[in-house]
Amino acid sequence: MQGSHFVGTSIAILPGFGATNCSIDTSQVPCPIATFPQLAEKQRASHFTRNWHTFGAVQNVSPVGRLAPRWTHSAHSRYPIRVKRKREVFDNLAVFAHFSAVLDSLYPLFRAGLFQLDAETAHHLSLSSLRAAEKTGVLSLTCPQDAYASPVEVMGLKFPNKVGLAAGLDKEGNTIDALGRLGFGFVEIGTITPRPQAGNPKPRLFRLIPHEAIINRMGFNNPGIEAGVANVKASRKFSGVIGFNIGKNKDTPNENAADDYLICLRAAYPVADYVAVNLSSPNTPGLRDLQGAEASARLLELLKKEQEKLAAEHGKKVPLLFKVAPDLEEQHIADLARVFVDGGLDGVIATNTTLDRHAVAGHAYAAEAGGLSGKPVLEKSTRVLASFAHHLGGKAALIGVGGISSVEDAKAKIAAGADLVQIYTSFIYQGPKLVRELAEAL
């Protein structure tokens, strides 16, 4: 396959890094499909032997459309005529792989440029660029919808693959379609609270580049649950699973926290595939107190009763999960696991960010208040995950998140008991290539 020329186009698929206008001579980038044997073989299996009605409407193949061939039948045979469609799909995969390789090769350059900006400015620029790239069709050249599919069923939900985006990147739920194009099997938006809130004063987001880590003290800045629901309703192209991560407003006292969670649960229920209750952010004063066994039991009881009512009202069950901190001791984990099993919790997300700074001691930002995420939290987070897996005994689903930056890390989470995994910080540092690698490997 000869290289093509892709000139003067705005390339904008850079989480945390933004976009730039540039001229690219892709003929200098080796991109035949043979360069991607694992991808090619996986796509042969997934798209040539499986019907894609599960994840979206079946339609004709096009270079910028979903890889979902419409089978036609011959009057002379009871079998579908697939040869032409197979060839079209395979040729399109070469195009997609070509553009993906171009962007992967440019990624370090984009990252270096965006890392010159304030972290939060780069964050917003990146999300707006992603949305623009999705609307203009640029993303469809790099990743066809459902291209990295290895379906798995968890909590009664069908996930296109095991790799999700953790809460915190898309706080408003307005970038879901674009993120889905990058290969995520599920996207968790938020944290979202009942009322809009601005969050903590800036600066509140810090990169610890040598450690591939981030410290944030954002403070649940979000547009409020009504806006979040409206944004999700507008996301019509993503065929994966959408989770709502919900929290309480900063000015809501803990004794009234259940009211905030109930407001969010009711509002999100019609459009959410699952709802995650954030009890573990270190950036809302007193929030982690809700992780106490008694407080969690009371909250879970109220939420489960509401879940049952909403399930009857809407004719579907939306799984309920709790997101926990990595800074839990073994006895605390055992107590919480007992509460979760007794209360019928559907799943646990392990874990949130850590307050521990030992792994980044000496860095200029180590003393900044907030939660630490990225590579330094891997060991601590995986320990908590494994402990929950032991105490839950398979009676609740587990999503492993925290420090995943490679296929080996993700497999370690699965080995520790995770049914699914999520990434965030490593996505900022490594880009969409990591999503594809994880989705193909798990």
Where are these regions (language model features)?
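Glycine-rich phosphate-binding active-site loops on the catalytic face of alpha/beta enzymes
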Residues: E188-P194, I349-T354, A410-E437
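Alpha-helix-loop-beta-strand connector modules within alpha/beta enzyme cores
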Residues: A213, P223-E226, A230-S239, A293-H314, ...
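Residue-level detector of structural "landmarks"
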Residues: P32-Q38, A75
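A gly/proline- and charged-residue-enriched helix-loop-helix capping module
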Residues: G190-G240
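Glycine/Thr-rich beta-alpha phosphate-binding loop at enzyme active sites
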Residues: R131-A133, V138-Q145, P282-A295, R338-G394, ...
